């Protein structure tokens, strides 16, 4: 019977793929057996793959991986366990793109190893995905640390945003990636009524991580960092850093390195 043969061919082509995804060391396989359980029939008896099953598969993998946007536990330099509410760093699976790739691979009907697509990537792959290098800033202690491969590379006093002036306190209780980095840079403040920047500052090292907030040296501070300076004479929100420390951090971090502020 021709229609039966046709149906068998359709079923075989729908269930012919064998796809493997490896997530955190665990292999998930979509094979003939799985695909048979994903089949649905319409009112005319035609078979297709149930999209909700494909979606659920990707969602389940993404839920194991995603850290971006979720609160993050962190152990501070002093060994305290804290929770960072704002988290703009981490892994985030691009669910739509990953679903598209899954559908394409199923249509191709062959055996292949699959990779998920990501809208955000972290530096590390373990549960604590900070990677080999991270920067830690304590507002209360006005201190910044930089770690590389578990070793302390820099410990320095800093001056953060001026808490006596509205809108200048450095945003804290979060984790952000370094967006970009450059040397010999002139920072410009917001424009005043005449269209001129409110301030300009030339810096040797510039590492923004949260909008206009970044780590940089500042010659005008001389050797005055740390202590209570931030309470009355702090920055516009940035992390003012002694030159040598800024240089070492600049040479240690890369774009995407996480910065933790609390």
Question: Locations of the language-model features?
Answer:
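Surface-exposed, secretory/extracytoplasmic low-complexity segments enriched in Ser/Thr/Asn/Gly/Pro
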Residues: 1-176, 180-199, 205, 253-255, ...
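Exported/periplasmic cell-wall-interacting domains
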Residues: 56, 171, 189-262
């Amino acid at each position: 019977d021709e229609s039966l043969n046709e149906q068998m061919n359709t079923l075989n082509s729908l269930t012919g793929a064998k796809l493997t995804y490896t997530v955190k060391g665990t292999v998930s396989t979509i094979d003939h057996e799985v695909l048979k359980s994903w089949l649905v029939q319409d009112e005319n008896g035609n078979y297709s793959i149930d999209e909700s099953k494909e979606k659920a598969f990707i969602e389940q993998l993404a839920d194991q991986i995603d850290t971006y946007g979720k609160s993050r536990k962190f152990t501070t330099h002093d060994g305290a366990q804290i929770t960072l509410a704002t988290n703009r760093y981490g892994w985030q699976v691009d669910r739509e793109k990953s679903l598209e790739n899954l559908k394409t691979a199923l249509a191709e009907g062959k055996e292949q190893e699959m990779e998920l697509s990501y809208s955000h990537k972290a530096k590390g792959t373990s549960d604590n995905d900070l990677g080999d290098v991270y920067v830690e800033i304590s507002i209360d202690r006005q201190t910044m640390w930089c770690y590389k491969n578990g070793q302390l590379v820099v410990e320095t006093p800093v001056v953060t945003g001026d808490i006596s002036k509205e809108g200048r306190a450095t945003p804290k209780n979060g984790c952000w990636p370094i967006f970009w980095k450059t040397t010999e840079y002139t920072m410009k403040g917001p424009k005043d009524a005449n269209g001129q920047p409110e301030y300009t500052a030339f810096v040797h090292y510039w590492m923004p991580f949260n909008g206009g907030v970044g780590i940089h040296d500042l010659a005008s501070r001389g050797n005055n960092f740390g202590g209570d300076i931030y309470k009355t004479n702090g920055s516009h929100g940035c992390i003012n850093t002694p030159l040598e420390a800024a240089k070492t951090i600049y040479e240690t971090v890369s774009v995407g390195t996480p910065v933790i502020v609390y």
